[in-house]
Amino acid sequence: MLRRNSHLGVKHNFIKNLNGVSMKIKLALEWFLNPDHLPFLVAKDKNIFKDLNIDLEIIEPDDHYDGFSELTNGNIEFATNEPLHLIEKYHSNIISLGNFFETNGGIIFSENGYKKLLDDQLVKISSPVSNNVTDTIALDIIKKHLENLSVIRQKKTNIIVKDFYHIKNIKDGLDAAWLCFENFEGVESRLEGLKVKKIYLENVNIPNFCALDLFTSKSFFENNKNLCKDFKKGTEEAIKIIINDLDYALYVYYSKTKQEKTELMNSIIEDTYKRFLTPFHNSLEKWKSLYDYTIKNKISDISQTEYSSMFAKI
């Protein structure tokens, strides 16, 4: 369920903008508000959305998949999430408007945890979720890495459901954490001075999906194409500002979130602000290799036609 959800349950199949009246638009994030969402904070701060007659409400979810659920039900207009979650199964009423952010990532092991992996001991990996999709990929990362080292492993690797505080979980004794992003956990592990072993997707030739797309519903898009185009262009305009002005990125993040300034958050923003993409990357083309990987590894069973239908031509 989405937080601040008093507005939910009201469907918005058609929104018409008349006489410059601002439209209330709801965007559900994939997790808690963080620097990956800077474009939306900047677009609000610079009145980019306001000038487009868009009154944006940003919503944090209780669950990682809430945004997709609310899009499907017509309760919100936009959502952000990793492209993998679009591809892992067919969504008849969800489409991507493009890819606006990409980092790199995978599994981060503690020094001792990685030694246990190589020594064929039981290994415990923390993850915010455990399901066939994410577990299959995590175990495939390990399998491919060990094959590259010609290491044979017999003992079990367990995925332990924890929260998303990956580095804390490693410090608390778990052997590794997944899915870690370089601009977050990579930064934090360096700042903490931890001795870790990173096994990222690109290290084992698995297509990257440590990224965020902007999603809407097909029904909303069909009835509001101009608004969707405006929202995308407004976000792209905000990204142009961010990637050229670290000081402003720092300012707007703290001013909009009211968070206390910390060395960790400063470092995360400094690593993040250059990773935004403008114009958005074409997701249909960009995630094709990821789609092929999910089909080959029986993670997804959607057809090529279904895959192609989940991306907007915009």
What does each model-identified segment do?
Residues L149-N158, T257-E270, S300-Y307:
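Short, surface-exposed acidic
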Residues H12:
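Cationic, low-complexity basic patches in intrinsically disordered or flexible, solvent-exposed regions
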Residues K24-I159, D175-L179:
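Short, glycine-/small- and polar/acidic-enriched structural segments
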Residues N224-K296:
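Secondary-structure end/capping motifs
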Residues P83, Y165-T257:
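Pocket-lining segment of extracytoplasmic ligand-binding domains
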Residues Y291-I314:
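Conserved C-terminal helix/tail region of periplasmic/extracytoplasmic solute-binding proteins
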Residues R3-R4:
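Basic polycationic patches enriched in arginine
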